[in-house]
From Swiss-Prot:
Propeptide span(s): 23-47
InterPro entries registered for this protein in UniProt: Conotoxin
GO molecular function terms noted in the UniProt entry: ion channel inhibitor activity; toxin activity
Name by which UniProt lists this protein: Conotoxin Leo-O2
Pfam families the record matches: Conotoxin
Signal peptide location: 1-22
Domain of life: Eukaryota
UniProt KW keywords: Disulfide bond, Knottin, Neurotoxin, Secreted, Signal, Toxin
Disulphide bond pairs: C49-C59, C56-C64, C58-C69
UniProt family annotation: Belongs to the conotoxin O1 superfamily.
Domain remarks: The presence of a 'disulfide through disulfide knot' structurally defines this protein as a knottin. The cysteine framework is VI/VII (C-C-CC-C-C).
GO terms under cellular component: extracellular region
Tissue distribution: Expressed by the venom duct.
Length: 73
C-alpha cells in the first residue's frame, strides 16, 4: 500500500514538472549556435544603413540594400 502511494505521488510530481517546463521550451531552439545565427540574421535585418551597395557601419560582411543591412553573398 505504501509503495503504491509513493509511486502515484512520484508519477504526479514528474507529470507536474513536465507540464511546468513545457510552457518555457516552446519557442526555444535546442542548440545555442542556431540561436546565435538567428539573432545575427535578425540583427542584420533590422539595422538601418545609408546608401545602397555601401558597407554597413554596424557589421562586417553586411551591405546596404537601400534601407536595411543584409549579409553580402
Amino acid at each position: 500500500m505504501k509503495l503504491t502511494c509513493v509511486l502515484i505521488i512520484a508519477v504526479l510530481f514528474l507529470t507536474a514538472c513536465q507540464l511546468v517546463t513545457a510552457d518555457y521550451s516552446g519557442d526555444e531552439q535546442q542548440y545555442r549556435a542556431m540561436r546565435l545565427i538567428d539573432a545575427m540574421r535578425n540583427f542584420g535585418d533590422t539595422r538601418s544603413c545609408g546608401r545602397r551597395g555601401k558597407p554597413c557601419p554596424c557589421c562586417r560582411g553586411f551591405r546596404c540594400t537601400g534601407s536595411f543591412c543584409r549579409k553580402w553573398q
